[in-house]
Amino acid sequence: MPFWKAGKNDDQVLDELKEMQKQNADEFVKKQEHADEAQKSSLIIDNNFTPVEYDPQYILQVNHLKKYFPIKGGMVSKTVGYVKAVDGVTFNLKRGTTMGLVGESGCGKTTTGRTILRLYDSKSGGQVLFNGQEVYDLSHKELRALRTKMQIIFQDPFSSLSPRMPVGEIIGEAVREHNLVPKAEFDDYIDQVMDNCGLQPFHKDRYPHEFSGGQRQRICIARALALNPEFIVCDEP
C-alpha cells in the first residue's frame, strides 16, 4: 500500500498509515506466537531420547546431539525461529580408531565437532559422553583439565593462529599452561613436536604470516599434537 495517492487528503493518508501499522503489529504477534510454539515443540523433541550408559570400549559416545541457533526478528529482536545446524546426530567412536563425517558444505559437520568439544556454551539436546563423562555437566575446572585430552585442528589455519605470537609460543602455550613438560625439557619437547610435523626448530621464532598455507596447517596440527590428546577433531585440515 503506497504512502500517498493523488486526490487523497491528509486524513485519508493518516488512516491508511494507521491501518498499515496495525497490520504490521498483527503480523509480528503471529510470528512471535509461532516462535513460542516452535520453542515449546523443540523442548519436547529435545527431551525425547533414551540416555545411553557408558561403554568402556568407546572413548566418545554421541547420542541424539542437537545444536540450534536462534533466528532473531521483529522490533525487539525476539526469537522467531531456529536454524537446526545439528539435529539428532548419534555415533560411537572406539579408542584408537578414525571416523569420517561426510556431508555437503553447510550441513553441520563443523558445528558437530565444536559442539562435541563444548566450544559453545550449551547444546540444544542429547548427550556427549567422553570417557563416560557428560561434557556439558563438567565444571569450569574439570573442563579445563579435559581440554588436554580433546583437541581440534581448525579448518582455517590463518584465522586460528595469533598473528602476534611466534610459532614456538603458539605450539607450546598450552603445554606450558598445563605444566605437561618440565621446564628444562620444554624447548627440546617443542622441537620434537615440530620435527614430527615437518617443521624445523628455527621456525619457532617466525610468525604465522611468514608461512605458506600448508605450513600454517602443520603448525595447527603441531599445536594439537603437543598436548598428546586422546581425541582430535580434524576439521578438513
What are these regions (language model features)?
Residues 76-79, 135-151, 177:
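ABC ATPase NBD coupling module
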Residues 125-134:
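Conserved ABC transporter NBD signature motif
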Residues 134, 185-202:
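Conserved ABC ATPase "signature" region
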Residues 207-211, 215:
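Conserved ABC ATPase signature
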Residues 221:
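Hydrophobic anchor residue at the start of the ABC signature
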Residues 228:
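Conserved catalytic motifs of ABC-family nucleotide-binding domains
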Residues 232-235:
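Catalytic Walker B motif of ABC-type/P-loop ATPase nucleotide-binding domains
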